[in-house]
Regions:
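Short glycine-rich His-centered loop
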Residues: 2-23
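Active-site-proximal helix/loop segments of hydrolytic enzymes
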Residues: 2-4, 24, 28-139
Length: 139
């Protein structure tokens, strides 16, 4: 049985564009990245489920429910940070519910692999208050 990953493109719809800079909206960047990563994973035998494939809004509770009801093995949510200070968030950061077990190890491995491709590793941080991390039953 193939590994199942739910991929969430953070933000979406007219109510939640995420970070915006000079007309560029985070929700669109997240969707493009989610679809590209999902395609690569699918081509390599992973069963991919998307929380959204178009510009729609879902609450974090709905996103967690999709992952839980689909019986996903892993949940991956893409976001992009922004700051008025140049290059403050230039790199990759992974957020997990806590720093134990598979979730933390997987996040470190993802950051490391992206680091090998030239991305700055901004680390792995515990964020137990985030609904999609608190409500999903998988790493």
């Amino acid at each position: 049985m193939a590994t199942k990953i739910v991929i969430d493109a953070g933000h979406g719809g007219s109510v939640d564009p995420g970070a915006v800079y000079k007309g560029r909206e985070e929700k669109n960047d997240n969707l493009n990245l989610a679809m590209a990563v999902g395609k690569i994973l699918s081509e390599n035998g992973v069963d991919v489920v998307y929380t959204r494939t178009d510009d729609t809004y879902q609450t974090p509770f709905e996103k967690a429910q999709i992952a839980n009801e689909d019986g996903a093995d892993f949940f991956l949510s893409f976001h992009r940070n922004s700051s008025p200070m140049p290059n403050q968030y230039s790199g990759v950061e992974s957020l997990v519910y806590d720093l134990s077990g598979t979730k933390a190890e997987l996040a470190k491995n993802i950051n490391g692999a992206l680091g090998e491709l030239g991305f700055k590793d901004l680390g792995v941080s515990a964020r137990p208050g985030l609904v999609v991390l608190r409500r999903t039953r998988m790493p």
